[in-house]
């Protein structure tokens, strides 16, 4: 049993990008699917597909990873911020700027999962799920 499925998903993505895998499979949930779709919209992942593998009882999210022209990693750093043991909530004014605006902080708000720029624009704070650049 996993105590933090979001951290597991981020670790799988981190490990797959470091070994230059084309795809990575993670156990599916609605929250993870929203997070994966946000990564696609921000340009860090090429695609996401919800599927069921042969003989598996549960759905799986298959993320197609993205690399640069010379196979350099698009995701250079990915880190879980708010954990089950220590939640991290911030107001709209205190949303972190990641790598001087070149990175993304993923924030869970009352309007759904949003990148930090969008949350700042809408004036909503929330729980900082992870940061990446």
UniProtKB/Swiss-Prot annotation:
Entry keyword set: Ribonucleoprotein, Ribosomal protein, RNA-binding, rRNA-binding
Any one GO MF annotation of this record: rRNA binding
GO biological process, one term: translation
Gene3D superfamilies in UniProt: 3.30.1370.30, 3.30.1490.10
PROSITE patterns referenced in this protein's UniProt entry, alphabetically: RIBOSOMAL_S8 (PS00053)
Protein task: One of the primary rRNA binding proteins, it binds directly to 16S rRNA central domain where it helps coordinate assembly of the platform of the 30S subunit.
Membership in a protein family: Belongs to the universal ribosomal protein uS8 family.
Descriptive protein name: Small ribosomal subunit protein uS8
The organism of origin for this protein: Deinococcus deserti (strain DSM 17065 / CIP 109153 / LMG 22923 / VCD115)
Gene: rpsH
């Amino acid at each position: 049993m996993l105590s933090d499925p979001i951290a597991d998903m981020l670790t799988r993505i981190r490990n797959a990008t470091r070994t230059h895998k084309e795809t990575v499979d993670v156990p599916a949930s609605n929250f993870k699917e929203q997070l994966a779709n946000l990564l696609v919209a921000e340009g860090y992942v090429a695609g996401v597909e919800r599927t069921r593998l042969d003989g598996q009882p549960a759905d799986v999210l298959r993320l197609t990873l993205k690399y640069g022209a010379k196979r350099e990693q698009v995701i250079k750093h990915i880190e879980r911020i708010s954990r089950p043991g220590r939640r991290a909530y911030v107001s709209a004014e205190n949303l972190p700027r990641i790598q001087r605006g070149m990175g993304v902080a993923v924030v869970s708000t009352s309007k759904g999962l949003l990148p930090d720029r969008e949350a700042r624009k809408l004036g909503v704070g929330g729980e900082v799920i992870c940061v990446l650049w």
